[in-house]
A protein has these predicted regions:
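His/Asp/Glu-enriched, well-ordered alpha-helical/loop segment
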Residues: 150-154, 158-163, 242-243, 247-249, ...
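Histidine-rich, glycine-flanked metal-binding segment
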Residues: 1-21
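Metal-associated gating/positioning segment near the N- to mid-region
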Residues: 14-82
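Histidine/acidic residue-rich metal-binding segments in metalloenzymes
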Residues: 100-249
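A glycine-rich helix N-cap at a beta->alpha junction
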Residues: 77-93
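Divalent metal-binding segments
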Residues: 29-39, 54-69, 89-100, 117-126, ...
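C-terminal cap of metal-dependent C-N hydrolases
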Residues: 315-384
Length: 387
């Protein structure tokens, strides 16, 4: 402990709490622009702050999709006006061939990654042309892929032949993870020039098909891409985390309103508010260690995208800090949810551990259930790639 007699220095007593580098979520869908009845940069960033996330990266499948430099510039400007936490963006690859736009954006430094959909998901961004995919891998920086089943093999091959790095989003099954493990063990496929990064989401760790099949309502609510898998798959994914084959936990925060989910088959669920709590509960049960949690949620995401001043608690680093109560027992209720969609698949769940405080660029934006009073007028978030 250090005593600061200078009244200008704010002191926060965090004894007994877990203090870690701010959580970085590399996989969100903030629905802004075009789908802001589901979420927007203001409400989504508040959900992040409540969940302990100090930096989010947003995916390009909005309306319109982020497949031009102009669209990306507009998203950056909108987020800068309202975001409670730091933000970055993945540029989108288009089936209509936007190679020149990809070159321009990656070259300018506005984005360091390109998202490629190799399977169908929300938005019309599926790319099946192998020649076009090869060009995207050549110029797209770190390529984030939505790839399922055999498409993972294809993405790994494209990265080895043409790419500069491959980030495989939301791996959901034992079969897919075994494919990734095999590739990571092969130095011809996974090396410094062509690295492979593996992401797993909390919902693929803690939800399974048995839960979805429990009722007609659950069968509508618990739908996403990739779909939930068997309980044996969730166990294998957790073991892969412990074995060091998983690099990050990404939420794939993809909210839809409750009415939309119950009215028609709609893929995606909210996750920003609950990801840390779910992982803390896993740590409390002995499934993972707290140092591993910090590596998956803070250190590795920063390193993967070259955020050299984030992901660490050190002199000169950005003052992005997540503080958690690791022993508190609590239950999630609908009244607790701040995401605009207003619901969570984890309502009624009992947790051990939750976010206590979120500090963004030295500003306390969330503390023990309350947001900073001036968060709307003075948003704390900054664009992570200052040009």
């Amino acid at each position: 402990r250090t005593t600061y007699p200078d009244a200008r220095v704010g002191v926060v007593d965090l004894e007994g709490r877990l203090v870690m580098p701010g959580i970085i979520d590399l996989h969100t869908h903030m629905r802004d622009p075009g789908l802001t009845h589901k979420e927007d940069f203001y409400t989504g960033s508040r959900a992040c702050a409540k969940g302990g996330i100090t930096t989010f990266f947003d995916m390009p499948n909005t309306q319109p999709p982020t497949v031009t430099a102009q669209a990306l510039t507009e998203k950056i400007a909108q987020a800068a006006r309202v975001s409670a936490v730091n933000f970055g963006f993945h540029f989108g690859a288009s089936k209509n061939n936007n190679i020149d736009e990809i070159r321009r954006v990656i070259g300018s430094g506005q984005a360091r990654s390109t998202k490629v959909f190799m399977n169908v998901s929300t938005g019309l961004m599926l790319i099946e042309d192998t020649a076009l995919l090869a060009e995207i891998f050549k110029v797209g920086g770190l390529v984030f892929v939505h790839a399922e089943a055999e498409m993972i093999d294809k993405a790994i091959e494209l990265n080895a032949r043409y790419g500069n790095g491959l980030y495989i989003c939301h791996i959901s099954s034992e079969e897919e993870m075994r494919t990734v493990i095999k590739a990571k063990q092969n130095p011809a496929l996974h090396n410094r020039q062509h690295p492979i990064y593996a992401e797993v989401t909390p919902h693929h760790l803690f939800l399974h098909t048995g839960m979805r099949e429990a009722s007609a309502e659950a069968d509508m609510l618990l739908r996403m891409k990739p779909e939930l898998k068997a309980q044996s798959d969730t166990a294998f994914l957790m073991q892969a985390i412990r074995d060091g084959y998983v690099d990050t936990i990404g939420t794939d925060h993809a909210p839809h309103t409750l009415d939309e989910k119950l009215a028609q088959l709609t893929f995606g669920i909210p996750g920003a508010e609950t990801s840390l709590a779910l992982m803390l509960a896993a740590a409390a049960k002995g499934n993972i260690t707290l140092p591993l949690l910090q590596k998956l949620m803070s250190e590795n995401p920063a390193a993967i995208l070259g955020l050299t001043h984030k992901g660490v608690l050190a002199k000169g680093a950005d003052a992005d800090i997540t503080v958690a109560d690791t022993a508190v027992h609590w239950q999630l209720g609908r009244k607790d949810i701040v995401s605009k969609c207003g619901w969570s698949p984890f309502e009624g769940w009992n947790f051990i551990g939750k976010n206590y405080m979120t500090i963004v660029n030295g500003n306390i934006v969330y503390r023990d259930g309350r947001f900073a009073a001036d968060l709307r007028e003075r948003p704390a978030g900054r664009f992570v790639f200052q040009i």
